[in-house]
């Protein structure tokens, strides 16, 4: 079997799919994207095509190494996201050829189900109580929300109180009947992160995500030393080599590699194993589409340290398409009591509605994340 063609489709709301075709008619799908940089990743995918056309898709490890090492300059969000989507599609092909789901090819299940959590609120958290109430009605009991709006390097008590009050209202409304994580999105400086973590401790959030930017990773162990709240990060780390540094340094309780950013299934399975060796939990990042989610689920079901799975149903970014709008076998992604079950169809287990993909790709938006500014006019972290 040989790879014959690679096609990319930019899609609403902010996704990109790719299709790898073979000379035997077997097709694999992947989801390579950096949110807000889809065109750039698309260009990288087609550059990698030169290494892939005419090659055997079954040699996933070798093709991964070629894409990663054949270029003197490597790594980073664009290259690793392109590799990620290609890698997903190669695993999809292998599973279809062998008539087995990807988790079966990776040694089989370590669990029967995995808890999912749902987003509530928006970029600036609002209507959180109502959002939680609605989602509880369809089985969710675990949630994530943005922990604050933009925050200055040294900000005032009002900004701190606004963040804390949202969390206090959640606990007052629901007590211990639900759990929630707080995503600070790297919006907070290290000095303000120390203040916020101290103030939030009594409300026992499930985790605090990206309290500082990934490039300030030296603060993770310092912040962890002052709190009992688990600290999570990883969506802006792109290979096992970046995760190696934070695991060695300590501080993170939960790793959140993104299966569409960090080299795909091949790389993230290695990252999951590294995390387990350090007694660190795994919770793959996935505010993206169905192929990315499927890839995450296969990793979850073969990784003992996986604890819960993000998914984008109803997330505030989903304008123009919802999580399963491009999927024919929607029933396979249904949740029972807030849990996903293993996908059982061969490959990734996603039956893509290709006609709908082609149609909506003709008018795909060029999504960009908001540009925020502080009151003084300086650029704020989004």
UniProtKB/Swiss-Prot annotation:
Cofactor(s) demanded: Mg(2+)
Residues at the site labelled Increases basicity of active site His: 258
InterPro entries: DgoD-like (IPR034593), Enolase-like_C_sf (IPR036849), Enolase-like_N (IPR029017), Enolase_C-like (IPR029065), Galactonate_deHydtase (IPR023592), Mandel_Rmase/mucon_lact_enz_CS (IPR018110), Mandelate_racemase_C (IPR013342), Mandelate_racemase_N_dom (IPR013341)
Keyword line: Lyase, Magnesium, Metal-binding
Cofactor binding: number and manner: Binds 1 Mg(2+) ion per subunit.
Site (Transition state stabilizer): 310
Top-level taxon in the UniProt lineage: Bacteria
UniProt EC number: 4.2.1.6
Principal EC category: lyase
Binding-site residues, Mg(2+): 183, 209, 235
Listed PROSITE patterns: MR_MLE_1, MR_MLE_2
A biological process term (GO) from this entry: amino acid catabolic process
One annotated GO molecular function: galactonate dehydratase activity
Catalyzed chemical reaction(s): D-galactonate = 2-dehydro-3-deoxy-D-galactonate + H2O
Active site, renumbered: 185 (proton donor), 285 (proton acceptor)
CDD domains: D-galactonate_dehydratase
Pathways involved: Carbohydrate acid metabolism; D-galactonate degradation; D-glyceraldehyde 3-phosphate and pyruvate from D-galactonate: step 1/3
Cross-referenced Gene3D superfamilies: Enolase-like C-terminal domain, Enolase-like, N-terminal domain
Note: Reaction proceeds via an anti dehydration.
PANTHER family named among the record's database cross-references: D-GALACTONATE DEHYDRATASE (PTHR48080:SF2), D-GALACTONATE DEHYDRATASE-RELATED (PTHR48080)
Family: Belongs to the mandelate racemase/muconate lactonizing enzyme family. GalD subfamily.
Functional summary from the UniProt entry: Catalyzes the dehydration of D-galactonate to 2-keto-3-deoxy-D-galactonate.
Name the UniProt record assigns to this protein: D-galactonate dehydratase
Species: Salmonella gallinarum (strain 287/91 / NCTC 13346)
């Amino acid at each position: 079997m040989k790879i014959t063609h690679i096609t990319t489709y930019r899609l609403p709301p902010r996704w990109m799919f790719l299709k790898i075709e073979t000379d035997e008619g077997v097709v694999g799908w992947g989801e390579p994207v950096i949110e807000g940089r889809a065109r750039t990743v698309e260009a990288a995918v087609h550059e990698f095509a030169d290494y892939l056309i005419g090659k055997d898709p079954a040699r996933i490890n070798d093709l991964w190494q070629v894409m990663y090492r054949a270029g003197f300059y490597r790594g980073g969000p664009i290259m690793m996201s392109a590799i990620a989507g290609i890698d997903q599609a190669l695993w999809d092909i292998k599973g279809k050829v062998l008539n087995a789901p990807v988790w079966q090819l990776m040694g089989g299940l370590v669990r029967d189900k995995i808890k999912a959590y749902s987003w509530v609120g928006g970029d600036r958290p609002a209507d959180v109580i109502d959002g939680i109430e609605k989602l509880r009605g369809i089985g969710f009991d675990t949630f994530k929300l943005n922990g604050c709006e933009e925050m200055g390097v040294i900000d005032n008590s009002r900004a701190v109180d606004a963040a804390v009050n949202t969390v206090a209202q959640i606990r007052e409304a629901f007590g211990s009947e639900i759990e929630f994580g707080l995503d600070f999105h790297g919006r907070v400086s290290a000095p303000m992160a120390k203040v916020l973590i101290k103030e939030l401790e009594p409300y026992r959030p499930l985790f605090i995500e990206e309290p500082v930017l990934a490039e300030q990773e030296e603060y993770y162990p310092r912040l962890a030393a002052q709190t009992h709240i688990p600290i999570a990060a990883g969506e802006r780390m792109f290979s096992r080599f970046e995760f190696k540094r934070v695991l060695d340094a300590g501080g993170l309780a939960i790793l959140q590699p993104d299966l569409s950013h960090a080299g795909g299934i091949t790389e993230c399975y290695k990252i999951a194993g590294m995390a387990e060796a350090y007694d660190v939990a795994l919770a793959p990042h996935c505010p993206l589409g169905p192929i990315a989610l499927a890839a995450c689920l296969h990793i979850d079901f073969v990784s003992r340290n996986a604890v819960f799975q993000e998914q984008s149903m109803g997330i505030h970014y989903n304008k123009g398409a919802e999580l399963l709008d491009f999927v024919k076998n929607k029933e396979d992604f249904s949740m029972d009591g807030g849990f996903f079950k293993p996908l059982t169809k061969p490959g990734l287990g996603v039956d893509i509605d290709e006609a709908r993909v082609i149609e909506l790709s003709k008018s795909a938006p060029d999504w960009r994340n908001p540009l925020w500014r502080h009151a003084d006019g300086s650029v704020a972290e989004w």
